[in-house]
Regions:
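N-terminal subdomain of nucleotide-sugar transferases
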Residues: 1-55, 175, 199, 232-240, ...
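Membrane-proximal helix-turn-helix segments that form the acceptor-binding/catalytic region
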Residues: 20, 88-107, 124, 128-132, ...
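Conserved donor-binding/catalytic core segment of Leloir-type glycosyltransferases
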Residues: 177, 210-228, 234-238, 375
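Carbohydrate-associated surface elements
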Residues: 182, 201
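Nucleotide-activated donor-binding/catalytic signature segment of Leloir-type glycosyltransferases, i.e.
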Residues: 243, 249-277, 282
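Short hydrophobic beta-strand element within catalytic cores of glycosyltransferases
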Residues: 283-286, 304-314
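Conserved acidic donor-binding segment of nucleotide-sugar-dependent glycosyltransferases
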Residues: 326-327, 331-338, 345-353
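A charged, aromatic-enriched C-terminal amphipathic alpha-helix characteristic of glycosyltransferases
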Residues: 350-380
Length: 390
């Protein structure tokens, strides 16, 4: 089938979309992606094509260091209050501007048989073009969209109306995908009967992971920004010193944090992250307990650690707890509590070999080859004519 994927995320860095594209082209589908800020010369696997629609970068702060000592003073407080007040409208405006530009791009394309919407901020656009082309709509909910912790002033009415809109639009989809059992249950409770889970797992490694007999450090590899519980990481690093704590990842604009004894290391390729994870021996999967989306999340870094064969210390949130305890992947800490995080690290070190064995065994199930089959099977069913067709 001819498949159009639509996403407002930067495609080059969205591993879920890249893996889904590869799985579908590998199954014989023709895939075109319209995404955000695609780098010049960027290509996709399997002959899939991609084109870019740019989006406003958002409200910008000062030009000071992104990770370091926070700025203070009356002027800074006024600026922060202004951002807090205006950010919700600005976020909606930039997303709408992207959809308007993307609609013009889509209008110039030949019709597709399937329109695959990645996240709610593309769902209305995707549904409109699926209807125009008499195509099948697929909704891929990477997050529990209206239950996220967002910067800026509270917007309770937007959340209530948004959930209603999401339900009305998603009911037009032939199938809905999401990233965890917890989010799937919540979407079903809200009225979507067919929700299937495709976790953000990684392909199995070609070579079995090699780890030290005892861990030599902690690694946080992921986005550096609000909601990642990094102040707790900094406090735990102080309590665990001189045991090294490393931080690797892109830094959100305007995010300020005094890293203390945490060592910032350069970003690198996914394969190189595997190596650093394996050399350190422990992966940090940290989140704040500030929203339902976090409580039901299964972050990429959990499955990256499984691919690398590395045990985790993770936030004690319902969905993370369920997976980590089921597979014996590591230990849990109370979000926001650096002392709890440090204690969880010590507990993991005390039974390190046992957790390594658990991660190794979990790799047989927690891998992209397993999850890709859910996607490919669903598309195979979409390609079949209805039983009553003549």
């Amino acid at each position: 089938m001819r498949v159009l994927m639509v996403a407002q995320s930067p495609i080059a860095g969205d591993s879920r979309i890249l893996r889904e594209v590869a799985a579908l082209t590998g199954a014989g589908h023709v895939v075109h992606v319209v995404g955000r800020d695609v780098p010049e010369g960027f290509t996709l696997e399997g002959g899939a094509t991609v084109e870019s629609v740019s989006r406003s970068a958002g409200l910008r702060g000062g030009s000071g260091p992104a990770v370091g000592h926070g700025q203070r003073g009356a002027k800074v407080l006024v600026q922060r209050f202004g951002r807090w007040l205006l950010l919700p409208e600005h976020r909606l405006r930039t997303e709408k501007q992207w959809r308007t530009a993307a609609a013009a791009t889509l209008s110039g394309l030949e019709p597709f048989e399937v329109v695959h919407a990645h996240d709610f901020n593309t769902l209305e656009l995707a549904a409109a073009f699926a209807s125009r082309w008499s195509a099948t709509l697929v909704y891929d909910s990477h997050e529990l969209w209206f239950d996220r912790a967002l910067p800026g002033r509270p917007t309770p009415l937007w959340r209530v109306r948004g959930r209603r809109s999401e339900l009305a639009l998603a009911r037009q989809a032939a199938v809905v995908f999401t990233v965890s059992d917890g989010i799937a249950r919540r979407l079903r409770e809200r009225g979507l009967p067919d929700v299937r889970v495709i976790r953000n797992t990684f392909p199995r490694p070609e070579v079995a992971p090699s780890l030290p007999s005892a861990p030599t450090g902690l690694l946080y590899a992921g986005r550096v920004g609000a909601g990642r519980d990094l102040p707790a990481v900094v406090e735990a690093a102080r309590l665990l010193a001189p045991f090294p704590t490393l931080l690797m990842g892109s830094v959100d604009p305007n995010y300020r944090l005094d890293l203390g004894s945490v060592q910032k290391v350069p970003e690198t390729s996914i394969d190189e992250v595997d190596r650093v994870l394996q050399e350190s021996g422990i992966s940090l999967v940290t989140l704040t307990n500030t929203c339902e989306n976090h409580r039901l999340a299964l972050p990429n870094k959990l499955f990256h650690a499984v691919r690398a064969g590395v045990p985790v210390v993770a936030a004690d949130l319902p969905e993370l707890r369920a997976v980590i305890t089921r597979y014996h992947l590591g230990t849990l800490y109370t979000p926001g509590d650096g002392a709890s995080l440090a204690a969880a690290v010590r507990s993991l070190i005390a039974d390190y070999a046992g957790y390594v064995d658990g991660v190794r065994a979990a790799g047989d199930e927690l891998n992209w080859e397993h999850d890709a089959e859910v996607l490919v099977s669903a598309y195979s069913a979409l390609a079949k004519p209805p039983a009553n067709a003549h």
